[in-house]
Amino acid sequence: MLLGSSAGGHLAGSLATRFTEDVYSPVDAADRQSARPDLAALLYPVISMQADITHPGSRAALIGAAAGPSLVDRYSVDRRITDDTPPMFLVAAGDDNIVPVENSILAYRAMLAHGRSVSMHLFETGGHGFGPNLPAASPASRWPDLLLAFAAAHRLLG
């Protein structure tokens, strides 16, 4: 299982959608093993590089603020989802003022369009960067248990 949040969610989503790409010449047998994760858990992730949806700082750092359409497509996780993308678990909060929740929705829709297993949990509140640190009374505090249940449903837990 692979987990990433915010910009780390983009990294995790990229690995989940680009694991077949050759990024270096193999040195030994380990380099020939699949890099496909069994499950990708993305928390309030940066998914899209589209200027009106992305986190501007992430886009500027990764592809540049003035990047053209081909770079936007290449680095937008939702546009890289295929029929081979592993199951995906998404968590976001509607009041996230850092990474628009539309990012998670785009990933969810793309997973459905490719018939992939996906579980999205969109909470009313939680903001950005909450991780496992929310008060127990907050509905978003349940995401770790929801992730474990999703992983168990995919037989990834003992």
Which positions does each model-derived feature cover?
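Primarily recognizes the serine-hydrolase "nucleophile elbow" in alpha/beta-hydrolase
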Residues: M1-T54, V72-D73
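Active-site nucleophile elbow and catalytic-triad environment of alpha/beta-hydrolase enzymes
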Residues: P26-A30, A65-R80, T85-P86
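Loop/turn elements at helix/coil->beta-strand transitions in domains of secreted/extracellular proteins
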Residues: R36-L39, T85-P87, H114-S119
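Short beta-strand/loop motif that positions the catalytic acidic residue
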Residues: D84, F89-A92, D96
